[in-house]
Amino acid sequence: MMNFADTLVILNDDAPCELLRKKYAEMLVPTVSVSSFKRNKIYKTYNNVFLYTYREFDFLWDLDDNILHKVQRCLNKSGVLKLVLYISNTAGGDSQRHDEIAKRLKKECLYSGFINISNETNMAENGIIINVTAENPDFLSNEDDNDEHSSDGEAHENAEDNKKVVNRVCANCTCGKKANGVKLDTVAINEKEVQYLTENAVSSCGNCYLGDAFRCASCPYKGLPAFQPGENVKLNLDNEPN
């Protein structure tokens, strides 16, 4: 049995739909008119959306204000749209025309992002009823949630990315930052060895102490082994084994 607590009913503004409106109101099922649904923002998502229209259905082809796309956005993942279109005999058309309308409805649902789309045409008093059922994919998230929610992993990745944002030194630096960035405190031990004092090492990228694999091409520490900040580093100037 369907849980109507998770169902929204959209009704076109015509007389037959007014009877349905009263019926669903007695069942305490939320209902909204087509014009109101298109005009206002829906803040809740539903497992099921019923869309009823009698006689008038041209609004379903409106590309500038696509109601099916908006329905898709207010459905939960794997939520179901049930579209019910009544066409009276006085509206004209034959079975071929009705089939064309059903096919177009399926295409519009597909273009709006629905899957598992099916349709059924039934005879009714003084007309026919076209039923189209479509499902909202579970791999799509609601548009409103995309702006407000993210997984813990995504938040962690964003935080890590922010840590990597650094203020680089300009090639033609005139403020003195470049000079400070390449400054190394050195103490000569002998003619073959120099000791580098890294406690006050300055770097624009912050990766210099990790080793050459992480250093930029102009790194002042290029060629030095990896070191810990504050560690005294000795470099063999002749590149001979110690």
From Swiss-Prot:
- Give the protein name, as stated in the record: Anamorsin homolog
Question: Where found, per UniProt?
Answer: Cytoplasm; Mitochondrion intermembrane space
Motif Cx2C motif 1 extends across 205-208
Q: Which InterPro entries match?
A: Anamorsin (IPR007785), CIAPIN1 (IPR046408)
Keywords for this protein:
4Fe-4S, Cytoplasm, Iron, Iron-sulfur, Metal-binding, Mitochondrion
Q: Please list the residue ranges that the record marks as compositionally biased, kind Basic and acidic residues.
A: 148-159
The UniProt annotation puts the region (Fe-S binding site B) at 205-219
Q: Where is this motif: Cx2C motif 2?
A: 216-219
Region feature (Disordered): 140-159
Fill in the domain comment. Answer: The C-terminal domain binds 2 Fe-S clusters but is otherwise mostly in an intrinsically disordered conformation.
Gene Ontology cellular-component annotations? mitochondrial intermembrane space
| PANTHER family the record matches | ANAMORSIN
What job does this protein perform?
Answer: Component of the cytosolic iron-sulfur (Fe-S) protein assembly (CIA) machinery. Required for the maturation of extramitochondrial Fe-S proteins. Part of an electron transfer chain functioning in an early step of cytosolic Fe-S biogenesis, facilitating the de novo assembly of a [4Fe-4S] cluster on the cytosolic Fe-S scaffold complex. Electrons are transferred from NADPH via a FAD- and FMN-containing diflavin oxidoreductase.
Q: Which GO BP annotation is one of this protein's?
A: iron-sulfur cluster assembly
Q: What cofactor requirement does the entry state?
A: [4Fe-4S] cluster
Q: How does it assemble?
A: Monomer.
Protein family (similarity comment):
Belongs to the anamorsin family.
Main localization of the protein described in the UniProt heading: cytoplasm
* GO molecular function per UniProt: 2 iron, 2 sulfur cluster binding; 4 iron, 4 sulfur cluster binding; electron transfer activity; metal ion binding
Extract the ranges annotated as region (Linker).
141-162
- Which residues does the annotated region (N-terminal SAM-like domain) include? 1-140
Q: Where does [4Fe-4S] cluster bind?
A: C205, C208, C216, C219
